[in-house]
Amino acid sequence: MVDGKATRQKLITWDPAKTEPPPAPVDGEWEVCYVAVQDFHTMSLVFDWLNTGRHPFRSVVIDSLTEVQKRCKDQVAGLATLSDREWGDLLIKMEHLVRYYRDLVFHPQHPIECVTFLALTEEKKGIMKPAIQGALSISLPGYVDLEGYLFVEETADGPVRKLLITPFTSANPPHTQYQAKDRTHVLTVKYGSFVSNPDIEEMLKIKEEGETNG
């Protein structure tokens, strides 16, 4: 719902600085609500609306956390190089953002079913991980139930989208490691290390059933 590119689904736009959230769709008139994030303050505005519970949304996708951090840097230091104190401010703001959005799934009146953070990927010391600067790159995995690495695998039947959900090291040199984790363990039991053509609604259903059955 926040930033990212338009999808093939029915799309509407929303400016949280000007209006309240759109009414619930009637007869499938819209499926995705898109918010253009041009400054970090917009992220706070969206959260404030979501936290009221007075909205029609079931899920939130932030695309991408890498870009949101850049917007946060713009707010903290503009075009200047970040000082040590400003790096600290950046970490606090970004950690608050991640945790506050994540906690929307526990909202007492209108819990969000799923909050998804997308990010670009970069290699750090031989490990492929989210392209997030500073200490947040270390703490981020601890804030979420699932950290995955999404890629496309070419097969005889054509390209297949796959989501890695457990740590993995490539067999060929330079033996790159891929950072991933499934804190629920339920998804790993169902899919193994890779989810082919991942469907978030299906994965949520499996997670909920696994947690219910213990």
Region roles according to the model:
Residues 49, 67-71, 143, 147-150:
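Conserved, well-folded catalytic cores of nucleic-acid-processing
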Residues 36-39, 83, 193:
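Intrinsic-disorder-associated interaction segments
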Residues 59-139:
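P-loop NTPase motor core
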Residues 1-61, 66-67:
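Conserved P-loop
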Residues 113-189, 194:
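Phosphate-binding/switch region of NTP-binding enzymes
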Residues 2, 60-62, 101, 147, ...:
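Generic structural hydrophobic/aromatic packing signal, biased to beta-strands
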Residues 191-214:
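Glycine- and charge-rich intrinsically disordered segments
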